[in-house]
């Protein structure tokens, strides 16, 4: 045990695409003595860790928490007693519905040095990858980001009367199971039934899928599309721009699943990913490598 506690850095991993991880976030991941990570989209994040780094999976998704938040808070504190640098790697941005504030306060109250490295939020990045600008002159002058998920794994109690301005884009996180009720709530509050709406699944990843409709029919459309979490709901006239601005799904290999041998500096993997391919890297032989699923994942 260290005489003094080490430093804990909360790093936002971004929306899933490793290319959207910040340079500062990557630096801390590479320096970490202990990496405490959530359910991440790519094993590449873990492959950045140095040899000997302690990897601890505390994955959290709806209805399936490997470790409760209170236990995660205590874990970070305990690990800071043994390691000089502990990195808490969180999807998106630590302070955008990531409970990063709770973790930081818990540590600060125990005199642990804390730093926060912001991440690219999926509330903006997933929209961009789907061809939807969150604001657009003459269409949307602002945006609201709302969690559709409560502390008890139920639908959040949303005051839809605050979301009726048609010049404001509404983005709902963690609400795939509640699309119909969200659409109904917005229409009841006064939003037009023909207001464009979209649901984006696995935004910024090669597995990205989107469903476009209106408030009146988006609930039925996503049932037919069978989209999966994580997903984002977008409501507003900016959704109508997606056909013209969608660069992501128009890449030549988008949606193609390709399995390749894992090599840490494999330029072929990088090139295929740039072209939109969904790459599954696999270990070959006994050398160091990275499996297709994060170590410690269920």
Locations of the language-model features?
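A contiguous loop/helix-start segment that scaffolds small-molecule binding in enzyme catalytic cores
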Residues: 2, 6-8, 82-86, 150-271, ...
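A polyampholytic, Gly/Pro-enriched intrinsically disordered region
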Residues: 78-80, 133-145, 215-226, 297-298
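Phosphate- and divalent-cation-binding pockets in alpha/beta enzyme and binding domains
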Residues: 44-47, 98, 124-126, 181-182, ...
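Class I SAM-dependent methyltransferase SAM-binding "motif I" and its flanking Rossmann-like core
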Residues: 17, 93-95, 100-166
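Class I S-adenosyl-L-methionine
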Residues: 1-18, 23-120, 224, 231, ...
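Short gly/pro/ser/thr-enriched loop/turn and capping motifs at secondary-structure boundaries
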Residues: 43-44, 63-65, 121-125, 142-145, ...
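Short, surface-exposed amphipathic charged segments that create phosphate/polyanion-binding patches used
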Residues: 70-75, 129-132, 159-160, 211-217, ...
């Amino acid at each position: 045990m260290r005489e003094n506690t080490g430093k804990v850095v909360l790093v936002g991993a971004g929306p899933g695409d490793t290319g959207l991880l910040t340079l500062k976030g990557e630096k801390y991941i590479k320096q970490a003595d202990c990496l405490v990570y959530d359910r991440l989209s790519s094993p590449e994040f873990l492959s950045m860790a140095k040899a000997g780094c302690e990897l601890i999976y505390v994955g959290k998704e709806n209805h399936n928490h490997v470790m409760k938040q209170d236990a995660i808070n205590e874990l970070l504190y305990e690990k800071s007693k043994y390691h000089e640098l502990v990195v808490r790697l969180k999807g998106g941005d630590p302070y955008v519905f990531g409970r990063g504030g709770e973790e930081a306060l818990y540590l600060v109250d125990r005199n642990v040095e804390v730093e926060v490295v912001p991440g690219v939020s999926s509330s903006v990045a997933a929209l961009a990858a789907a061809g939807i600008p969150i604001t657009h002159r003459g269409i949307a002058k602002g945006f609201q980001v709302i969690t559709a998920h409560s502390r008890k794994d139920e639908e959040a109690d949303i005051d839809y009367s605050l979301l009726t301005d048609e010049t404001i884009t509404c983005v709902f996180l963690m609400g795939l199971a509640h699309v119909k009720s969200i659409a109904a709530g917005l229409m009841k509050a006064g939003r037009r039934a023909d207001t464009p709406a979209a649901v984006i699944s696995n935004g910024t990843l090669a597995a990205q899928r989107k469903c476009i409709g209106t408030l009146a029919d988006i609930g039925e459309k996503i049932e037919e599309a069978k989209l999966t979490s994580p997903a984002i709901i977008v409501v507003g006239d900016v959704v109508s721009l997606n056909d013209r601005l969608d660069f992501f799904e128009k890449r030549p290999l988008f949606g193609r699943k390709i399995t390749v041998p894992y090599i840490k500096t494999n330029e072929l993997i990088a090139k295929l990913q740039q072209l939109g391919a969904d790459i599954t890297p696999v270990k070959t032989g006994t050398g160091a490598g990275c499996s297709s699923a994060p170590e410690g994942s269920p």
